[in-house]
A protein has these predicted regions:
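Short Gly/aromatic-enriched secondary-structure transition segments
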Residues: 73-85
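Localized edge beta-strand/strand-to-loop motifs within extracellular or lumenal beta-rich domains
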Residues: 149-166
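Order/disorder boundary and secretion-linked terminal/linker segments
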Residues: 1-76
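Extracellular/luminal beta-rich ligand-recognition
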Residues: 82-146
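Beta-strand secondary-structure signal
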Residues: 47-49, 58-62, 95, 154-158, ...
Length: 197
């Protein structure tokens, strides 16, 4: 029997290499990670994809294995919680912003390395302006365990709507990540996105 290969339509699958930026002047190419003389801080490469799967959307991140990422992933993947939590962006976090095209309403999904997650609902850009943001109850997130590869880590999750199919071709989105390496003895946020705004 021949294998069935799914044929993707142009709006069914997108993959990006995320670009790293920081708002800190402490970050430059001479900085060394955690004072390790042999390990200059070069931001790990992160690739992200978003794909249509039946009635849901799949989001995945590949994080390059470096001394820094190996340290954080190996520590946190041992204690996977798989529960909702707020303020995940204050530590290493992977995010997907998803909205219907031509709509100001959107959801923000957050996933931490330890399995904590959340989905927030916004009526417009950061509206309502409250902390923590309003939890979204119309979507669910199903998370796969983090895959450990020779050269990196893969985080994957699915976003589903309770009452209707999500169609990626009808959506606008942004995939982002935040890592917090130690630079000059302080945690510094490094922001990743394929589209920084």
């Amino acid at each position: 029997m021949a294998a069935t290969v799914k044929r993707f339509l142009p709006n069914d699958f997108f993959i990006y290499q995320l670009t790293a930026i920081t708002d800190s002047s402490a970050y430059d190419d001479t900085v060394r990670l955690d004072n390790r003389p042999d390990n200059r801080l070069v931001p790990p490469k992160i690739y992200a994809y978003i794909a249509q799967i039946t009635d849901a959307v799949e989001v995945g991140f590949f994080v390059e294995k470096t001394a820094y990422t190996q340290d954080i992933f190996d520590k946190q993947t041992k204690n996977v919680l798989m529960q909702r939590a707020d303020y995940l962006w204050q530590s290493e976090c992977f995010e997907c912003f998803l909205a219907q095209k031509y709509s100001s309403h959107y959801i923000e999904t957050n996933l931490a390395i330890n399995g904590c997650y959340n989905i927030y609902r916004f009526d417009g850009y950061r509206t309502p302006n409250q902390m923590p943001p309003l939890a979204d109850t119309q979507h669910t997130l199903s998370i796969r365990h983090i895959a450990v590869l020779d050269d990196g880590y893969v985080l994957t999750f699915h976003i589903r709507h309770h009452n209707q199919a999500l169609r990626l071709g009808e959506c606008q989105f942004n995939l982002t990540a935040i890592l917090y390496p130690i630079i000059h003895k302080a945690y510094v946020a490094v922001y990743y996105a394929f589209k920084h705004t």
